[in-house]
Amino acid sequence: MLAEGLHSIADTGNQGLLLLGLSQAKKPPSVRHPLGQGRVIYFWSFIVALMLFSMGGLLSSYEGVDRLIAPVQLASPGIAIAILLFAAIAEGISLRAAVHEINKVRGERSYWTWFKESRQSALLIVAAEDSAALAGLVFAFTAVLASAITGNPLYDALGSIAIGGLLIVVAITVSVQIKSLLVGESAAPEVRLAITRFLENSPEIIQIDSLITLQQGDQVIVLLKAEFRNEPSAIKLLADMQQIKAAFLAAFPQVEMVYMEPMIHASQP
C-alpha cells in the first residue's frame, strides 16, 4: 500500500510538471528563443521520467526490502482492498482517456510502434504512467489479498518490490524515448511522407534536393532546398515561393516555420 501511495504522490507531481511544460511550450518565438520553446516539454517529460524512477521505483523497492528485513503485519486489509479497487477504477478511466487520444493519431500502427515513433511526449508519459499505475494496483491487490489470506506479511513486501521494479523498467523505457526527442528528431514518418508528396506535386518545384524536418513539441520546422522552375525574374520566383509556402502552411497546420532555399534549374525554359 505504501508503494502505491508513493507512486500516487509521484504521479500527481508529474501531472503538474507536464502542465507546466505544456504551458511553457506555447510561448511564442523570442530573441533568445528564435524557434520558440516547443521542445521544453521534452525537458519536463524527462524530469517526470526521473521522478517516476526515483520517487516511484527506488522508494517502492526500498520499502519492500525494508519490509522483508523487518516484517510488519498487515492492518485493516479490507480497507486496503477497498482503496485499491477504487484507485483501479479511477486509473482505468484515466487510461481509457489516454488510449482514446492515442487512437486518434496512431492510425494502423500497433501501440508499441506508436510509442517508439511518437513525438507527443506528454501523451506518451501519461499513457505509460497510467498503464504502470494500473499494473501496480494489480500487484498491490494480489499482495494484500495474499497477505490477508495467509497472514504472512512476506507477500506485501514482495508486492512493493514488484511495483518498484515495474516503475523502474517503465521509467527507463520512457527516458530512452524522451532522450531521443531532446537530442532532436524529425517529424513523424507519416508527416514527413505527406510533406514530401505535397512538395513533389507542386508545379513550381522541379526536384527536392534536401528536406529537413525538426519536431519542436507539437510544432514542426521545415527546411527545404529545391530546384524551382526557371522564372523570368527573381520577383516572380519569390512570388512562387510565397505561394507554395502559403499553400503548405494551410495544408500542414502543425508546421510553424518553413525555410526555403531555391536552386534554379538552368536548363528549364
Where are these regions (language model features)?
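Acidic (Asp/Glu-rich) catalytic motifs at the cytosolic membrane interface
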Residues: M1-K27, S61, V65, L124-V138
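A general, composition-driven signal for non-globular sequence regions
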Residues: S8-I9, H33, A239
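Alpha-helical transmembrane segments and adjacent TM-loop junctions that form the membrane-embedded core
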Residues: G38-P269
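Aspartate-rich (DDxxD/NDxxD/DxxxD) Mg2+/diphosphate-binding motifs
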Residues: L18-V40, A70
